[in-house]
Regions:
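Amphipathic C-terminal alpha-helical segment
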Residues: 97, 136, 140, 160-178, ...
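Amphipathic alpha-helical packing segments from all-alpha helical-bundle domains
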Residues: 118-144, 153-157, 184-187, 191
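Pre-recognition alpha-helix immediately N-terminal to the DNA-recognition helix
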Residues: 15-23, 69, 89, 93
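Short hydrophobic/aromatic patch on the recognition helix
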Residues: 41-52
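Hydrophobic alpha-helical connector segments
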Residues: 75-104, 155-159
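Basic, helix-initiating cap at the start of DNA-binding domains
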Residues: 1-27, 31-36, 40, 56-60
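Short secondary-structure transition hinges
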Residues: 96-136, 175-176, 180
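Amphipathic alpha-helical linker/stalk segments
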Residues: 3-6, 64-89, 119-130, 139
Length: 199
């Protein structure tokens, strides 16, 4: 008896995006040139343009894939935990991402990109699945009387900006702590912000 095994073979476009993402994760977005990606994939420098009209289109595809992957796992750490446990679970997800893949974090969250999401418009109504997970928790906290009534988007921005600012300082070498101690600093600082917005 013969069994057929079907293996999904990535398309050339997927291979190109995979190679660009690999370079970006390991070296940063500046290193992800069309020529370098083409060499890794094994296509000519001109052939890559059949799949992506320019470098920005390729980087946009990488960003969309990365955000999609992040949103699939974001917030699953303590799905049945208390409100506060879920908030800190999201913070841990964020820190795992930012500290574990700093080049990708920088590309997605802080580098200027033409198609990058902009606050507030692109963050409303689930426009950013990662940010949106915390917006939903903030709205829940307000409904349940845990947080003062306020603009959920702006409260979420206050919470995320604190952690992002600390990460920027840490990745820039401006905070002289090991990772474990830095994570504790992030938790304490987030708790201080939460204490300021509690009902």
């Amino acid at each position: 008896m013969v069994y057929a095994v079907y293996v999904s073979v990535p398309s050339t476009a997927e291979k190109i995006a995979d190679a660009a993402e690999d370079i970006l994760v390991n070296e940063g977005s500046d290193a992800a040139t069309m020529r370098r990606v083409a060499e890794i994939v094994g296509v000519s420098a001109m052939a890559i343009y059949k799949y992506f009209p320019n470098r920005q289109a390729l980087l946009d595809a990488v960003a969309a894939r990365a955000f999609r992957r992040l949103s699939e796992a974001w917030g699953t750490r303590v799905p049945d935990g208390s409100w506060e446990e879920r908030v800190f679970g999201l913070m841990d997800d964020f820190l795992d991402f930012a500290l574990g893949r700093p080049h990708l974090y920088t590309f997605l969250m802080t580098e200027q990109r033409p198609r990058a999401r902009r606050f507030p418009g692109d963050f409303q109504g689930g426009g950013s699945p990662v940010f949106g997970a915390l917006v939903l928790l903030v709205e829940e906290g307000m409904r349940d009387g845990l947080l003062r009534e306020d603009d959920p988007l702006e409260v979420t921005l206050a919470l995320t900006s604190t952690a992002q600012g600390l990460v920027q300082l840490y990745l820039g070498g401006r905070i002289g702590l090991d990772e474990e101690t830095f994570r504790l600093l992030c938790a304490r600082t987030t708790r201080r912000v939460l204490d300021g917005i509690r009902a």
